[in-house]
C-alpha cells in the first residue's frame, strides 16, 4: 500500500471526479486576506468546511446515545463561521464531495493550525467505493469559545492505494453513511 502524490490526486479528480469541486493548487489567500489553506498538497488534499454546522446543546438535557441519537442534542447554524462553546463539540460537512476508488483507502488528519488552538478535527477513513460529503467532527478542548471558518481548510486527506483490490467494498456492504448529502448524525 503506497501513499499517492499530487499528480495522482489531480488525475483522479479531473478524469474520474474523485473530489468535486477540486482545487488543483494549494490556496492560501482569498480576497487579499490570508486563510487556512486548502487544495492539493504534495501527498494529500486539504479539505474545506462548508457553512452548515450542528453544535451540541444541553437545552433538552438528553443523554447522548449513539444507538438512539436525539437530533435535539444539536442546534443547526448556517454561517461563515461557527463558534463552538468551551469544552463542547460540533459537526459540519465538507465543501467537497468524494468518490473513493475501490482500491483506495484514505486517512484524514486535522490541520495543525486548529490543533494548536485546542480544536481537534476527527474524521474516520473513507473506505473503498464510499462516496458523499464528509461529516466533520470538531472538539473544542479549551475553556474558551473556539471559531471554525467555513470555506477554509480544516483537515488533510491522505490517499493510500492497495496492492490488491478488496473483496468487499463499502458500497458492496451498503454502508450506512453512503451518499451523505449534508451533516449526517449518528446511525446505529
Curated annotation (Swiss-Prot):
Function statement: Catalyzes the deamination of dCTP to dUTP.
Active site per UniProt: 137 (proton donor/acceptor)
One Pfam match: DCD
EC number of this enzyme: 3.5.4.13
A Gene Ontology molecular function term of the record: dCTP deaminase activity
SUPFAM superfamilies: dUTPase-like
Xref: InterPro entries: dCTP_deaminase, dUTPase-like_sf, dUTPase_trimeric
BP GO annotations: dUMP biosynthetic process; dUTP biosynthetic process; nucleobase-containing small molecule interconversion
Pathway connected to this protein: Pyrimidine metabolism; dUMP biosynthesis; dUMP from dCTP (dUTP route): step 1/2
Family designation: Belongs to the dCTP deaminase family.
Assembly behavior: Homotrimer.
Reactions the enzyme catalyzes: dCTP + H2O + H(+) = dUTP + NH4(+)
PANTHER family cross-referenced by the UniProt entry: DCTP DEAMINASE
Keyword terms: Hydrolase, Nucleotide metabolism, Nucleotide-binding
Domain of life: Bacteria
The protein's name: dCTP deaminase
The keyword Hydrolase is assigned to this record: yes
Gene, per the UniProt record: dcd
Binding residues annotated for dCTP, in chain numbering: 111-116, 135-137, 156, 170, 180
Amino acid at each position: 500500500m503506497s501513499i499517492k502524490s499530487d499528480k495522482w490526486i489531480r488525475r483522479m479528480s479531473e478524469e474520474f471526479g474523485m473530489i468535486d469541486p477540486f482545487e488543483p493548487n494549494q490556496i492560501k489567500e482569498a480576497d487579499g486576506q490570508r486563510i487556512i489553506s486548502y487544495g492539493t498538497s504534495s501527498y494529500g488534499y486539504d479539505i474545506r468546511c462548508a457553512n452548515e454546522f450542528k453544535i451540541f446543546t444541553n437545552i433538552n438535557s438528553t443523554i447522548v446515545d449513539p444507538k438512539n441519537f436525539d437530533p435535539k442534542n444539536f442546534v443547526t447554524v448556517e454561517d461563515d463561521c461557527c463558534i463552538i462553546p468551551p469544552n463542547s463539540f460540533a459537526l459540519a460537512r465538507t465543501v467537497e464531495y468524494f468518490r473513493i476508488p475501490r482500491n483506495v483507502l484514505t486517512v484524514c488528519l486535522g490541520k495543525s493550525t486548529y490543533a494548536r488552538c485546542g480544536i481537534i478535527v476527527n474524521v474516520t477513513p473513507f473506505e473503498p467505493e464510499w462516496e458523499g460529503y464528509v461529516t466533520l467532527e470538531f472538539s473544542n478542548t479549551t475553556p474558551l469559545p473556539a471559531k471554525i471558518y467555513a470555506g477554509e481548510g480544516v483537515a488533510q486527506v491522505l490517499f493510500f492505494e492497495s496492492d490488491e483490490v478488496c473483496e468487499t467494498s463499502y458500497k458492496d456492504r451498503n454502508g450506512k453513511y453512503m451518499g451523505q448529502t449534508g451533516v449526517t448524525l449518528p446511525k446505529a
